[in-house]
Every structure is written in C-alpha cells, then in structure tokens.
Curated annotation (Swiss-Prot):
ATP binds at N257, P258, K259, T288, E320, G345, T346, G347, R468, R474, D734, G735, E736. Residues 1-108, 394-438, 535-605 are annotated as: Disordered. It is an enzyme of class 2 (transferase). Its EC number is 2.7.1.91. Catalyzes the phosphorylation of sphingosine to form sphingosine-1-phosphate (S1P), which probably acts intracellularly as a second messenger perhaps by promoting cell proliferation. Residues 40-106, 549-597 have a biased composition (Low complexity). SMART domains: DAGKc (SM00046). This is Sphingosine kinase B. GO terms for biological process: dihydrosphingosine-1-P pathway; positive regulation of asexual reproduction; sphingosine biosynthetic process. Substrate binds at S313, G314, D315, G316, D461.
Length: 760
C-alpha cells in the first residue's frame, strides 16, 4: 500500500517497533522554512527531530509544558466550513493557565433537555450590568448551570449551550492581568473569550441518527475579572471534571485505514481534526500500510503514552488491533486503555451499536472521554485442519457425519440417547486417533468484538467485497444475489443456554444504554430475568383485565415465572423441543466446568479456503478462557447443559452487539457488557421461500426479523459450530474470513474499555 502522506519512518519509539507512517502532530514543523510558523520549539515532543513533511498547520504543544498555547485554534475558525454559524475572526494570542481541578466526573442526562436545565440551580451568573456582549449585542444575562449555559438574549429569547457539546474555552490573552480590571493597555478593550462546541446540526427529538457540527460562541467581557470568572467556571464545571480530564491535557493515538469502505478515511480525519484542534488535544497519526499493521501496533507499540487509541476505519482495523493488544504479556494493563472508533467503513457495526455512526459525534465522544466495558469473544479452531472438501455425493474422509432423515435441524439434549449413539462411536474413534491430545499449541485463537457468522450472512459479507466502492449498497446487492442463488449448509451448532426465556420474552429485554442496569450488574442473567418477569407480570395483569378467560392459561404460566425455554423451531418435534428447554440455573453456571473431557469428534477444514489470517510471530491472545472447549466430546457437553442443533441451515449469526451494519440490526436487545452471545439462525424448512427470506432481510433493518417463525434466537454463554465437510462454505469473525472448520466461541465479559456517548 502506498503511503500517500510521504511521511518518513519514526526513528525513535519507546518500547515498540519502528512503524511506518507514524505522524506525531505535535512534531510538525522541523524544516527551517517552517520554523518561523512554530509557536514554540519547546512544544516538540520528539527530541530526535524527525523530518515530518506534513501539511497540517496547527502545532500541538508538548503535554509536559503547562503553558499550552492555543493561538491557532481561534484563527482557524475563519476557515471553518462545517456550518460554523457563529464564526469569530479574532486572532488572539492565548495562554493556558492549565487549571486542573479534578471534580467528580460530569454525568449527562438527556441531550437537549431544555426544561430540565431551566430547573437547575445557578452556579454562576453574569447580569446585564456587567455589559456582556454576544454577537456584538448586549445580553440580559449569562447563566452557568451544571448541565449547560443559558444565554438570556432578551426577556423572551434565550439560547442554551448544553454541557454535552462543550469541548474547550479559548485561553485568556497574554496581556491579561488579574490584578486590574482591564487589560494592561492604555485603552480599555473588550476581552473576548470563545467557547468551542460540537452541536447537533438541527433540532432532533431523538438521537438515534444524530449529526453534529463545530460551532463557536464568542463573548465580550468588559472587565478582566468577569472574563476570568467565566473562563474558570467553564474549566471547572465542564472540562476538568470530565472522566479523562480536560481535553487540552490529553494525548491520543489515531490509526487510519485508507482502504476502509469507500476510501473516505482521510477526508473524515480532516473533518474531525478541526474539532480536535479546537479542543487542544494532542494527536499522533498513523496510516496503516498493510494487512496486520494495526495488529503489530497493538502488540508492540508503547500505547501507555496515550490515554485513548482512536480508529478511523470500519470494524476490521479495531479487530486487528485488539488481536495484537490481547496477545501482549501486559494485556491486563493494556486492555484498560480506552479504544474509540470513528466510522469510515461499509458496515460500521460497532459504531452503529453504540449510536456513534456520525464521525463528528464519535469525535465529540472521544473528547468527552466516557467509557463503557465491552465484551470480547475468544474464537478457537484446531490449528491442524487438513480434511479436504468433498462433493455432495462422495465422502472420502475418516470422519463420520450423521444424516438425519429430516432437513430441519434436530435438537439434542442429554436425555436424547438415541440421537447420541453415532456421536459416541465417533468420539471413541477420535479419542484413540487423537490420543487425548490437549496441547493448546494445536489451537488457533482470535478475539472477536462483533460476531461469528456462517452461511448467508458470511457469504454476503465476504463475497460482496467486489462491490465495496458502492458503500452501503454493497451489502444490499450482495444479499439479493445470494438469496436468488440460495445455499444450504449442513452441520451442528452446540450452545450453552444462559437464560431460560423464549423468543417473545427476549424481545422484552431493555435495550443497552450508557447507564445500563444489565451491563453494570455483577449478575447480568439475574437482572435480565427479573426485568423480563416483571414486564411479563405487568403485561399479564393488563391482559387479564381485558381478556378474562381468553389468555388465562398463558397468564398463569407467566405469573408463576415458569421460564423453562421452549423450542423456537416450529418444525421440530414436541418431545425434542421440550428436552432442549431445560436450561436452568445449572446451565448458566457450567461454563467454567468444561475442562477435562476427551477431544470431540470432527476437525473439519477446506483446502480451498483462502489463506488463514496471518498471525506471523505474534502469539495467540493471553486472555484467560476455557482453552479446552474444542476438546469436549458431544456427550460431555450435553451432560453439562449444552444443547445441540443438527441439520440444514440457511445461516447462523452469533453476535455480542446489536448491529452488524447500519441497516442490519442483528439483535436489538444485545448488550455491550452482559457476558452473553445472541445466537440467531435460520433453519431450512419446507415452508421457507425466497420471498420469506427477502422479508427477513427487509425486517432486519429494524430488528423485526426476530419476530419471524423462521428464526430461532437464544441467549448463550458459549457455542461450538461444526459445519459439515460435505459442502464448502464461509465462516467469518467480525467480517474477516477464517478457515472453514470446527469453531468455538466464548464470551469474556467486559474485557475492553470502549469510548461511548454518555447520553441516551
């Protein structure tokens, strides 16, 4: 990949490799002809003076220098093209007092709640006698409250600047003297202080599709004391009290994938860069040059120099990075560093899941610094997978597969002894062949932040790469093509149920938010069960009042909290369905007990699969998990509460987030940090038609596809996928293709620290 910025390689980097295309935006002007534009040579962080020939025009000073100069920030407002309706052309030289009062972190309420802010007590007020001007006109008062600033323009007209949008306040002039009432000049001059914000582009009743822009507000104060009071209150009330401190005292590492999506990453960076400069935050930029570049950075670089690592890309770059990060010896400390995503890809599943699909909104969240734990799934496959693909009519391998008489998947439990006879024989044969080899070196591992997919979804995701230039249309076209040429896959899916709820009950699980009770609890399963049961009780009472006897049986069952799960597959037998629904509390506790059973029966692969993800010299992830999951026999799994579904599938999706793309809400009730996996699959049934699949595709844009009888939905803690070798297909994690083989997936709760918005 060509380096479009033509930056030389970094010559010195603490505790890390020499990585190409690293640009420290604190180290911009080293050529002699550019030195005259530099604010201060002491602002250069890198003492080795690399010659970085970038075109960026703002110097970001050394974070160790307490007198942080910000004079280019205000002057830059003259060139603001991002709908900055309140531009001010004042080009003041400002110094930062570096006020660092660390108060309790600010917590946001709901974006743009005018009635709430008007009821709040006043923290500081400037009245009409102090002759403050806004837009060169005198205002009645300027009121600072906990949730924002109220500008009383007249008795009937006011403007509110919400604290959610405030990112910086310009520094006071160099000639500012707190001992006098005016500036230290012979003539009294108004003192201008500019407030930098990132506001909603238009009035929005909801924030599901929010879009933001830069905006500045400039106030003129007649006395030094008034300007000092305003400046100090802004710093202490809104900026110093942010979770990661004042943005002007922070430093972030930015990784850009120039090939993400429609290749707009550089343009998106230029857009958010101006907001970062407004805030005074210090940046180091790296443009990835090749596959696995981000993985190397995550594994080797000294990330402790930064308080946040930012990715301007799709989900793939973050996927690469965490697979390097969690392979470090010091991963326990490294994983605490907040990660942030500014969406620039095609699907942008994670960004959509946290409501930050707008790049400017994502940049604002980075500056505000609120974080939330993020689940990571450990995906494992046998390293040695040499069984070739065979055609549908001939099987020439030593492994055996079952051939159910029905095309619909069958559900197996510990009580289904007849269905396990073949599995027992297979396990015995493989136990002898494998000699009870439990060596973890034979296991390949990946870390997943989104999903494991097999069948329709992975086919569309991987095979639509040729339509990447079309952006969002890529997935729509790919899905239409694949449904018209539908593929059916045979295999098994083992899963460990976490919650004994049926599909309709799971739809009443509250959606995830920043202050989510489910994610914040120590026992997410119990909280979910309590919430659902309470909701069901209320619904049943209403139904009983309206329909006394029609739904009496259903109401009684729900009110008695008999939450034994029932099969969501309408085509399976009653006895089989009942046996699969006995996932009680012992099921939820059995994850850690899967340790010492014999190796399971089949290790499948394809010699036609594209090359596996190249891990090079980077070891597998170090995160503690059940490394023997693939070695469990079928009988052992079933005896511990696992369920097995075997048969023909259209597609399988196992996800830990709500969205896999902007128009694909895989599981609306998925939570970022509940320790659970949403397992969703479509069985191949007699009543299944291409029209019904197209309907499911359309409904997936809102999450209503889960209401279809054709879809099964389970909340699980872990799963094992065994695709049949009789037909080649695609298995993918986070949109990245992996070998077509037996695959396990296990959720590690709250493993990472993700930047999120703090309002809902």
């Amino acid at each position: 990949m060509e380096n479009n910025n033509n930056e030389p390689a970094e010559t010195v980097q603490e505790k890390g490799p020499k990585l190409k295309n690293d640009i420290d935006l604190n180290d911009q002007f080293k050529d002699e002809k550019e030195k005259k534009e530099e604010i201060s040579s002491s602002s250069i962080e890198n003492k080795n003076n690399n010659n970085n020939n970038t075109s960026t025009n703002n110097v970001i000073p050394n974070e160790s220098n307490n007198n942080i100069s910000n004079n280019n920030v205000i002057s830059n407002e003259n060139n603001n093209t991002n709908n900055n309706t309140d531009n001010n052309t004042d080009n003041n030289n400002n110094n930062n007092n570096n006020n660092n009062n660390n108060n309790e972190p600010v917590t946001s309420f709901t974006v743009n709640n005018k009635s709430l802010i008007e009821k709040e007590p006043t923290l500081f007020e400037f009245n009409q006698e102090q002759q403050i001007k806004y837009k060169n006109k005198s205002i009645n008062s300027l009121i600072i409250k906990r949730s924002g600033i109220v500008i009383k323009i007249s008795q009937k007209k006011s403007t509110i600047i919400y604290q959610d949008s405030i990112i910086a306040c310009s520094e006071l002039p160099d000639n500012f003297d707190t001992a006098t009432t005016t500036t230290t000049t012979t003539t009294t001059l108004p003192i201008k202080v500019t407030l930098f914000t990132c506001v909603l582009k238009k009035k929005q009743l909801t924030i599901d599709k929010e879009q933001r822009k830069r905006k500045s507000y400039t106030f003129q104060f007649k006395s030094n004391q008034d300007s000092l009071n305003f400046y100090s209150n802004i710093q202490s009330t809104f900026l110093n009290s942010l979770p990661r401190g004042n943005p002007k005292n922070r430093k972030i590492r930015i990784l850009i994938n120039p090939k993400s999506g429609k290749k707009e990453s550089h343009n998106i960076f230029k857009e958010v860069e101006q907001l970062f400069k407004d805030s005074g935050i210090k940046m180091k930029l790296t443009v990835t040059m090749e596959p696995e570049h981000a993985k190397k950075i995550g594994f080797k670089s000294n990330i402790y120099k930064y308080d946040t690592v930012v990715f301007i890309s799709g989900d793939g770059l973050l996927h690469e990075f965490i697979n390097g990060l969690l392979s470090r010896e010091d991963y326990e400390d490294a994983k605490k560093i907040p990660l942030a995503l500014i969406p620039a890809g095609t699907g942008n599943g994670l960004a959509n899941s946290i409501g930050l699909q707008d790049p400017m909104s994502a940049a604002l969240a980075i500056l505000r610094g609120f974080t939330k734990p993020l689940d990571v799934c450990i995906v494992q496959q046998p390293t040695v997978t040499t069984i070739p693909v065979v055609d549908n009519n001939t099987v020439t391998t030593t492994t055996t597969t079952t051939s159910p008489t029905s095309a619909s998947p069958t559900i197996t439990s510990a009580n289904n002894n007849n269905n396990n006879n073949n599995n027992n024989n297979n396990n015995n044969n493989n136990n002898n062949n494998n000699n009870n080899n439990n060596n973890n070196s034979n296991i390949t591992k990946w870390c997943s932040i989104l999903s494991l997919t097999w069948g329709l979804v992975s086919d569309v995701d991987i095979e639509s790469e040729k339509y990447r230039s079309l952006g969002d249309l890529r997935l729509i076209i790919g899905a239409a093509v694949r449904i018209l040429n539908l593929r059916i896959y045979r295999g098994k899916v083992y899963f460990l149920p976490a919650i004994p709820l049926d599909k309709s009950q799971m739809q009443s699980i509250p959606k995830c938010s920043f202050d989510c009770n489910i994610c914040d609890s120590s026992n997410s399963v119990k909280v979910i069960e309590d919430l659902v049961c309470n909701d069901n009780d209320n619904n049943n009472k209403n139904k009983n009042e309206e329909q006394n006897e029609i739904n009496s049986t259903t109401s009684n069952n729900n009110n008695n909290n008999n939450t034994t799960t029932t099969s969501t597959s309408s085509s399976t037998s009653t006895s089989t369905s009942t046996s699969s629904l006995t996932a009680t509390t012992t099921t939820a506790k059995s994850t850690n007990s899967l340790s010492s059973s014999p190796r399971s029966d089949i290790n499948m692969s394809s010699n036609s699969i594209s090359k596996s993800l190249d891990i090079g010299t980077i070891p597998s992830c170090k995160v503690t998990h059940n490394s023997n999951l693939l070695n469990e026999s079928s009988d052992s799994l079933l005896s511990k509460g696992w369920k097995c579904i075997e048969g023909e599938f259209i597609g399988v999706v196992a996800s830990t987030v709500s969205h896999l793309a902007s128009d694909f809400i895989s599981s609306p009730n998925a939570h970022l940090s509940d320790g659970l996996i949403d397992l969703i699959f479509i069985n191949n049934r007699s009543k299944l038609s291409k029209a019904s699949l197209l309907s499911i595709l359309t409904d997936s844009a809102t999450g209503d596809h889960l209401k279809s009888d054709l879809i099964e939905h389970h909340k699980v803690k872990a799963l094992i996928l065994e695709p049949s070798i009789q037909k080649h297909g695609i298995v993918a994690i986070d949109g990245e293709r992996i070998p077509y083989a037996k695959t396990s997936m296990e959720n590690i709760r709250g493993c990472l620290n993700l930047i999120c918005r703090s309002y809902h």
